[in-house]
Swiss-Prot record:
EC number: 2.1.1.184
Protein encoded by which gene: ermBC
Family annotation (CDD domains): AdoMet_MTases (cd02440)
Keyword Iron applies: no
Organism: Escherichia coli
Class in the EC hierarchy, top level: transferase
Classification lineage: Bacteria, Pseudomonadati, Pseudomonadota, Gammaproteobacteria, Enterobacterales
Protein name: rRNA adenine N-6-methyltransferase
Length: 245
């Protein structure tokens, strides 16, 4: 099979592991699911046994044709041959997202599903190190994601679970959407603030006196142990100092 390395995938084929994953998804008969990466259709088939409707998006032509043949009689499954990064999720429909995503595109895809979809729950299989980076509020990605979703690990998936076997372990994570911590009208300011904050360009955000006031108000004694809630407090101080509130 000719592979586009950028979009290459490591497939889950073990029935035991697939069943463990399905159990963690806690799907209902009324659920509509969007799957990222049909692959060979192993997970797709199991999703369709429980959910009302599964729409599965696959870019690789060979895999799309293979899965189309395998799933052609399954009325609960709709296959779409498209790049997930170009796919438009519905605005007014309730749905969940499930995906075993390519490691190389983890950042792009997680941003896509969090910021360009309205999914209530998102389940992704990602590289273990990437999962840890999503929790790191000293990084841009962590500070952006936390405004919209909470993130938790559901299952650890050793490299032996996949074919071909990757060099790293993976995890199944759940992203649960919550009310945004940053209203839309402040989003551009927040992304600017975060870009400066993670690079410690504090002078681009505050005067010396403002910085000390913001730290005091957020009760920050040590910047190396700052919490997400404290960063939000500091951002609110930034808005106040700039007459935005």
């Amino acid at each position: 099979m000719n592979k586009n390395i950028k979009y290459s995938q490591n497939f889950l084929t073990s029935e035991k592991v697939l069943n463990q994953i399905i159990k963690q998804l806690n799907l209902k008969e009324t659920d509509t699911v969007y799957e990222i990466g049909t692959g060979k259709g192993h997970l797709t088939t199991k999703l369709a046994k429980i959910s009302k409707q599964v729409t599965s998006i696959e870019l690789d032509s060979h895999l799309f044709n293979l899965s189309s043949e395998k799933l052609k009689s399954n009325t609960r499954v709709t296959l779409i041959h498209q790049d997930i990064l170009q796919f438009q999720f519905p605005n007014k429909q309730r749905y969940k997202i499930v995906g075993n995503i390519p490691y190389h595109l983890s950042t792009q895809i997680i941003k896509k599903v969090v910021f360009e979809s309205h999914a209530s729950d998102i389940y992704l299989i990602v590289e273990e190190g990437f999962y840890k980076r999503t929790l790191d509020i000293h990084r841009t990605l962590g500070l952006l994601l936390h405004t919209q979703v909470s993130i938790q690990q559901l299952l650890k998936l050793p490299a032996e679970c996949f074919h071909p076997k990757p060099r790293v372990n993976s995890v199944l994570i759940k992203l649960t959407r919550h009310t945004t911590d940053v209203p839309d009208k402040y989003w551009k300011l927040y992304t600017y603030f975060v870009s400066k904050w993670v690079n410690r360009e504090y002078r681009q955000l505050f005067t010396k006196n403002q910085f000390h006031q913001a730290m005091k108000h957020a009760k920050v004694n040590n910047l190396s142990t700052v919490t997400y809630e404290q960063v939000l407090s500091i951002f609110n101080s930034y808005l106040l100092f700039n007459g935005r509130k």
